[in-house]
Amino acid sequence: MSIFIQLNNISVNFNNRSILSNISLALTPNCILTLIGPNGAGKSTLVRVILGLLKPNQGKIFFKNNLRIGYIPQKLNLHSTLPITVNRFMNLSYFNDKNYIQGMLSRINIIHLKHHPLQKLSGGEMQKVLLARALLKKPELLVLDEPTQGIDIIGKIAFYKLVNQIKNELKCSILMVSHDLSIVMANTDKVICLNNHICCSGPPETISKNSEFIAIFGNIGKNYLALYRHRHNHHHDF
């Protein structure tokens, strides 16, 4: 099996404090890997390591040559005194094919927003803009760090449905970081529960029975994982 990114015994320390301890995982083609864990578990730190933004104190990392990665951050901080439209934001990328950019805005159903200032967008609209920009390089791996934070339940469902459609179209892999157990798990192939170390990993139905997972998330998390596993034998209308 080909591998996009392989982490072997990765550890990260800040100020003599262990943030990540002996993390080993592999990101493979055409799969959805969901990373969950409590606040302070090291999820965002692990994402920075995977993106190559942070060098670990220990361990080895393997990246596929010329791996194309798209990234959607938790939040994009914009200064109110520097207004910028969606169209200008999209064109700030290295990608200079204007027709392709407009086509991507249409694909994500936000072409009507292209002249809107980013500061005026709703949370759901902003995440769609970030998704469109992340897709410009036709990523093999799409990394989403708490992508629906602050979005209402209907917006979350619509966003995850769109992401799953994109995944199927591009045949890309997705690394999802989230607390939204009730929704994110719907199409997840593998779950990793992180709390400084990897507590447990596997398909949702296996994780839901793990004692360390239950200790962190309780029976609410257990019920979410059991209830929302997608069996691919029905469809949803939104």
From Swiss-Prot:
It is a peripheral membrane protein. It comes from Buchnera aphidicola subsp. Baizongia pistaciae (strain Bp). SUPFAM superfamilies: P-loop containing nucleoside triphosphate hydrolases. One of its GO terms (biological process) is response to zinc ion. It is found in: Cell membrane. Residues 5-220 form the ABC transporter domain. The complex is composed of two ATP-binding proteins (ZnuC), two transmembrane proteins (ZnuB) and a solute-binding protein (ZnuA). This is Zinc import ATP-binding protein ZnuC. Disulfide bonds: none annotated. ATP binds at residues 37-44. Keywords: ATP-binding, Cell membrane, Ion transport, Membrane, Nucleotide-binding, Translocase, Transport, Zinc, Zinc transport. Its EC number is 7.2.2.20. It catalyses: Zn(2+)(out) + ATP(in) + H2O(in) = Zn(2+)(in) + ADP(in) + phosphate(in) + H(+)(in). GO terms for cellular component: plasma membrane. One of its GO terms (molecular function) is ABC-type zinc transporter activity. Its main location: membrane. Belongs to the ABC transporter superfamily. Zinc importer (TC 3.A.1.15.5) family. It comes from the Bacteria. PROSITE patterns: ABC_TRANSPORTER_1, ABC_TRANSPORTER_2, ZNUC. It is an enzyme of class 7 (translocase). Part of the ABC transporter complex ZnuABC involved in zinc import. Responsible for energy coupling to the transport system. Gene3D superfamilies: P-loop containing nucleotide triphosphate hydrolases.
